[in-house]
A protein has these predicted regions:
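Domain-level signal for Mg2+-assisted phosphodiester chemistry and nucleotide/NA-binding surfaces
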Residues: 1-108
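Nuclease catalytic cores that cleave nucleic-acid phosphodiester bonds
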Residues: 91-201
Length: 201
């Protein structure tokens, strides 16, 4: 049996927010919901569908990057977190946050993170850089990329998704008419890959 190369594509903010919705409240510390992306990839790789054998090829995590001049403390914390991810083998793809005219009363927004993830998911499939691509996000803007790889490359590439499952969270990315494997992650799964580090300190 051939070993399939698995790469996971993580939308950092979306997956963090999903963990908080599934397992925590707004009153919990901001570190609640943080996770180790490489541990996430290892966990996913260890739970393949029946009769599949997987090896972890890449862990790619996509994130918005604060402006160092506007939010120096937040920027420093972000860079420490990214350095921690990279030290364990993750590939970090960062895009600058967009600051609206009403900032700081209005929060900055991610810009281009989902586009970068979608482009990499498709181009890496076309280039044969993975056999199995897993998207860790519920952002519906990523559905076209998921659908493209499934429809055009399903004979050579497998697409899968993952999300947290709690008392109030049961969402996942899907493609109409497709049977796409989803790794549902429970609270005990989160606890096994949680990152309790406060990068502000």
């Amino acid at each position: 049996m051939l070993t399939e190369r698995l790469s996971i594509f993580i939308d950092a903010q979306n997956f963090y927010n999903g963990a908080r919705r599934a397992f925590f409240t707004n009153q919990d510390s901001h570190v609640c919901g943080q996770f180790d992306p490489v541990s996430l990839g290892t966990l996913i790789c260890s739970r393949p569908p029946a009769d599949a054998v997987r090896s972890l090829e890449q862990v790619r995590i996509y994130t918005g990057r604060p402006d160092a001049s506007k939010e120096p403390r937040t920027y420093a914390a972000h860079m420490r977190q990214c350095a921690a991810w990279e030290s364990k083998g993750a590939i970090v793809i960062a895009r600058a946050l967009r600051y609206p005219a009403g900032w700081p009363e209005t929060k900055p927004q991610q810009k281009g993170v989902d586009v970068a993830l979608a482009i990499d998911f498709v181009t890496m499939a076309i280039d044969g850089q993975y056999d199995v691509g897993v998207i860790a996000s519920t952002d519906t803007d990523l559905k076209p990329a998921l659908e493209y790889v499934w429809r055009k490359l399903s004979t050579t590439r497998r697409v899968e998704v993952t999300n947290w499952t709690g008392s109030t969270v049961q969402r996942r990315l899907s493609v109409p008419g497709a049977s796409i494997w989803c790794y549902w992650l429970k609270r005990e799964d989160y606890d096994s890959i949680a990152d309790p580090t406060d990068y502000n300190l």
